[in-house]
Amino acid sequence: MTASSSASTCARPLAAPMPRLNFQAVAPELYKAQAGINALLHESSLGIQLLELVFLRVSQINGCAFCVDMHTRELLSRGEDLQRINSIVTWPEVDFYDGRERAALNWAERCTRLSQAHPEQQDFEALRPHFSEREMVELTYAIGSINVWNRLCAGFAAPVARKPIKL
């Protein structure tokens, strides 16, 4: 490739990426079952706002562009503060999150980064003041569920369309 052909290639707009595979179409029964878990979680007492914060943080950790975009948009549509959304990547360093959110985000990180270290007893104990046993199970299912979605969307290259967010 010559310098001039390289420059012209870089100047062209890139085509929208295509998914490697449409997992929803290939295995609709599995997709439906996974979506059913999310529907149940949205009916839980955890609250959609907390779920979406957890979904966003786990998606950031896993590097799933599709899911980060989707959960950012969902939080904005539900009135979440932009500063809290932008700061979730550094949640331990800021005081924008209450004790319940901090415990959930910590648990989400520990349960997502299992290859680094498993959740410790102190991480579990930090949940107790904020969550019932049922809610702890629901939270852990939510973390597992978003990890599945991240692997599906990142693994099969779910495309992210450029859609500016209007604030």
Model-assigned labels for residue ranges:
Residues M1-L167:
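Hydrophobic alpha-helical segments
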